[in-house]
Amino acid sequence: MVAEAGSMPAASSVKKPFGLRSKMGKWCRHCFAWCRGSGKSNVGTSGDHDDSAMKTLRSKMGKWCCHCFPWCRGSGKSNVGTSGDHDDSAMKTLRSKMGKWCCHCFPCCRGSGKSNVGTSGDHDDSAMKTLRSKMGKWCCHCFPCCRGSGKNKVGPWGDYDDSAFMEPRYHVRREDLDKLHRAAWWGKVPRKDLIVMLKDTDMNKKDKQKRTALHLASANGNSEVVKLLLDRRCQLNILDNKKRTALTKAVQCQEDECALMLLEHGTDPNIPDEYGNTALHYAIYNEDKLMAKALLLYGADIESKNKHGLTPLLLGVHEQKQQVVKFLIKKKANLNALDRYGRTALILAVCCGSASIVSLLLEQNIDVSSQDLSGQTAREYAVSSRHNVICQLLSDYKEKQILKVSSENSNPEQDLKLTSEEESQRLKGSENSQPEEMSQEPEINKGGDRKVEEEMKKHGSTHMGFPENLTNGATADNGDDGLIPPRKSRTPESQQFPDTENEQYHSDEQNDTQKQLSEEQNTGILQDEILIHEEKQIEVAENEF
């Protein structure tokens, strides 16, 4: 069935999707030939889409958009998680550039740089040049900006879907559970009846979803049932169909009381589920700091990674959970951990546009020059995403680091230079002071000699004679023997006869010190002798007159 060019087939003539899949081949259903019968695309020269022929197929799609509808490419799989929910708010940036054109007609859809219609389709490619250059080989489904990440050529941001964290509680149907599982889930059975059930039934029995009574009771917060099962020593680390333990479900469902009881009885907190998440990942996602602290206390690995390579810290940054990120930093989480694309916590924070988390990470002296697998740094992502506040934060941090490094390099050299200059000045000063002290001593001695000579000339002789009676009378009062004591030599005995032994045993420095002390003592002795001699000469002269 091929319609004539320019005509549209009736909606009733459209085949069901199951028959359509085999005919689609490489064409997606929007471009499938029968949509317009042209063999090219479902748009005409006006560029308008006529979706009237798609009503039957659309009714089958339900909540799935055309991107993720399993029959879109005949793959039978969707491009997002099992929930199929699209965050349309994240598409605003791309939609604003696309105008009225859908992503299937968007010139960069196939990475070819051309539209999927002829030149008559009136596609305005000029408006798409900037975006097209960033998209590279990625089609609009996988282009990172579709998820609001602002990244390119690293991997689809859609890989970081939250499907693992969606719908944490079990979907339970009564007909799928036996008596023990019903009692564990609803918890309305009296304790006595529950004890009887445990005697008659295997407490570790699994239902169709591989859930035990402990799984159901923990996920629904029935702490009394959990306590009874633990007292009966049930198995703690059994996995359900998602490879989750009862502890993981309790943490995921934020049933802290049940989780603490399981930890106290020795449940392993590091068992990953099919997504690679541990109980700590779910505690961080829920921003449950108390539960995260308890898990770390019982040995949870703070550096465990899920299938995306996200540690609890990277997960907290990706989900913009600022409080738990701050908590993990205090617990010494590795700030340089990398996800599977080589992205650090700082790069993830920049890509998410979280200035507060970027500022928090910069306070920890994190490496801002780290590159991911595509060779991009945090600053390059900030510039390409036009996060002006984050760009300013990174620039300020870089300037501070440059000033810090320059100050650390300059201070030691200046201090060493100043110290050497001060030391040289001190040595020069000590050398100059010693000759001055030595030169002052002869001047003092010469001054004393001049006074004696002047006094002797005053009395007319340099050689004065004294009568015996005057001499005896003058000295009687002092208790002397009547003789004027002979004048002592100016040079002390120690200088007249130097001790050669001392010179041999003392170092040069010690000899210099002793020499200075002896010279000072000699100077004082000579001055005293001169004064005494002068006084006695004056007294003798007065008695003669």
UniProtKB/Swiss-Prot annotation:
Q: Which family does it belong to?
A: Belongs to the POTE family.
**Keywords from the named record:** ANK repeat, Repeat
What highest taxon heads this organism's lineage?
Eukaryota
Start and stop residues of the ANK repeats: 180-208, 209-238, 242-271, 275-304, 308-337, 341-370, 374-404
Quick one: where's region Disordered? 406-524
Give the Polar residues compositional bias ranges: 513-524
Gene3D superfamilies assigned to the protein according to its UniProt record, in alphabetical order: Ankyrin repeat-containing domain
User: Pfam families, from UniProt?
Assistant: Ank_2
Q: Which organism is it from?
A: Homo sapiens
Segments of skewed composition (Basic and acidic residues): 414-429, 443-458
Give the protein name, as stated in the record.
POTE ankyrin domain family member H
Q: Which PANTHER family match?
A: ANKYRIN REPEAT DOMAIN 36-RELATED (PTHR24147), POTE ANKYRIN DOMAIN FAMILY MEMBER D (PTHR24147:SF66)
Family matches, as PROSITE patterns: ANK_REP_REGION, ANK_REPEAT
